[in-house]
């Protein structure tokens, strides 16, 4: 699992050739999923959490608690927008054990997509089918998470959609 921290489009022929023919380049950080909520919050339920470095999403029963370093914010499920989709990803690092390889390409490609024979060490890279979960709202939240099994992103998205259909609690003074 990874959190995408930056991405950019491949625009020039040189970029296309040196990025294995990819159309977009990502900077990603390793992430993990757990059932541990924030340390300072005591709950009587397990809190599903996605963590990556100093960022975390804690899925509480009525809202999402977002941690960025020492700062916290909350977003009701009703304000969240999300998409889940399978994506083809050129993997230049170690292939996850549960990853599904669907194709392969070369580290350095020519314009037609074949191997660029000018490079002595031009390794073949696997193309995997990953799941992309995008979570955003109208107030600035925009996070893209990649998971090594495409169907997991869809399951998480369905669970979040179901959580958003539950009306928020009414707090009486």
Where are these regions (language model features)?
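A composition-biased, non-transmembrane "mature-region" signal
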Residues: 1-173
